[in-house]
Curated annotation (Swiss-Prot):
This is Small ribosomal subunit protein eS8. It comes from the Archaea. One of its GO terms (cellular component) is ribosome. GO terms for molecular function: structural constituent of ribosome. Part of the 30S ribosomal subunit. GO terms for biological process: translation.
Length: 128
């Protein structure tokens, strides 16, 4: 069944709201990519509204980490997810989202990109 992102048919009181218009295709959604740390890279290209393309990163083991002290960016390996405010279960499953704290070869880093939307993991090195 499709994911629908329109308004609910119920009010906060529980009363039923009668719809003035039917459901439209533009209100449909898709399941989240949930980018995982893996030993291989897997991307999925999806057609979006207006014939645009969106690259969803499903699995990866690399991130572009920016070191603010030295003003240098490096492609480094990601070992695991340390913290994720989006969902506490994402830590155990090694799912990266924007704002997640990951462990890399350079040290701890915070993800600044949206891997499920951008197709790449960009992060900023955290100073300890």
């Amino acid at each position: 069944m499709a994911i629908w992102q329109g308004a609910s048919r119920r009010l906060s009181t529980g009363a039923k709201v009668w719809r003035a218009a039917k459901k439209h295709k533009r209100e449909m959604g898709r399941p989240a990519a949930e980018t995982q740390v893996s030993d291989r890279i897997k991307r999925k290209i999806v057609r979006c509204r207006g014939a645009n393309l969106k690259v969803k990163l499903e699995k990866t083991n690399y991130a572009n980490v920016f070191d603010q002290a030295n003003k240098v960016c490096k492609k480094v390996a990601v070992t695991k997810v340390l913290d994720n405010k989006a969902n506490k279960h994402y830590i155990r499953r090694n799912v990266m989202t924007k704002g997640a704290i990951i462990e890399t070869e350079m040290g701890k880093a915070k993800v600044t990109s949206r891997p499920g939307q951008d197709g790449v993991v960009n992060a900023v090195l955290l100073t300890e």
